[in-house]
Swiss-Prot record:
This is Trefoil factor 3. Involved in the maintenance and repair of the intestinal mucosa. Promotes the mobility of epithelial cells in healing processes (motogen). Keywords: Cytoplasm, Disulfide bond, Extracellular matrix, Secreted, Signal. It comes from the Eukaryota. It comes from Sus scrofa.
Length: 80
């Protein structure tokens, strides 16, 4: 019985992590940390989060009056 509960927990955790990680497929959270005033529109009216992400863009609908689908920040390499 304990083994079944363990595997159930493993499956639930795997499902939860895959659904929450889907917001920025191929993008890091840092790339999508664009200040609202600096967002460059990357979508169109009524674009869904999935459609936006498929375009290689970030989606954040928590701030009204700014683009919700926007271009990510470009990651730069540090060279010393």
């Amino acid at each position: 019985m304990e083994a079944r509960m363990f595997w159930l927990l493993v499956v639930l955790l795997a499902l939860a992590s895959s659904s929450s990680a889907g917001e920025y497929v191929g993008l890091s959270a840092n790339q999508c940390a664009v200040p609202a005033k600096d967002r460059v529109d990357c979508g169109y009216p009524q674009v869904t989060p999935e459609q936006c992400n498929n375009r290689g863009c970030c989606f954040d609908s928590s701030i009204x009056g700014v683009p919700w689908c926007f271009k990510p920040l470009q990651e730069t390499e540090c060279t010393f």
